[in-house]
């Protein structure tokens, strides 16, 4: 935080920087002609690939922010680094950033786990603000999905899709 800025100015500046980083990452991806490398993974797509329908609630635990790689339903609103990809997320993002900077306790995010990857169900803005401020872990309520085991070659893992 810059000491001479009031909190509202700081929050506005944080969001502006986060959006600028997201736009720069998108431009660089286009220049490198990467195929959708800057998008979050869609949980529905990955779940379908793995035929993972068996869900088991695992409780609340601490999860590494870097392990959160995708979203349930909002994968277009944030980029691969959970930077805000759309200006429309700004008001909520700023509200979460303000609470973070005040040291307010925020509720756990809700995540789905598939193999070693996590997908946000609820808490996209909290994950985004945490990533922006280099917070290493978040408290999360986790439900785990297990893929059906089929004969034949295994589908690509969610983690392997990250490397693509």
What are these regions (language model features)?
Residues 110-117, 121-164:
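Glycine- and acidic-residue-rich phosphate-binding/metal-coordinating active-site segment common to enzymes
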């Amino acid at each position: 935080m810059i000491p001479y800025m009031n909190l509202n100015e700081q929050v506005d500046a944080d969001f502006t920087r986060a959006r600028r980083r997201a736009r720069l990452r998108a431009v660089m991806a286009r220049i490198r002609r990467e195929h959708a490398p800057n998008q979050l993974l869609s949980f529905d797509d990955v779940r379908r690939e793995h035929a993972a329908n068996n869900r088991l609630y695992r409780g609340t635990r601490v999860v590494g922010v870097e392990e959160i790689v995708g979203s349930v339903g909002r994968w277009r609103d944030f980029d691969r680094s959970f930077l805000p990809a759309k200006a429309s997320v700004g008001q909520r993002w700023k509200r979460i950033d303000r609470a973070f900077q005040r040291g307010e306790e925020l509720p756990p995010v809700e995540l789905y786990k598939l193999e070693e990857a996590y997908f946000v169900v609820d808490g996209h803005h909290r994950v985004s603000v945490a990533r922006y401020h280099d917070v290493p872990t978040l408290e999360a309520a986790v439900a785990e999905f297990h893929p059906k085991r089929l004969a034949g070659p295994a589908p690509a893992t969610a983690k392997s899709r990250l490397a693509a």
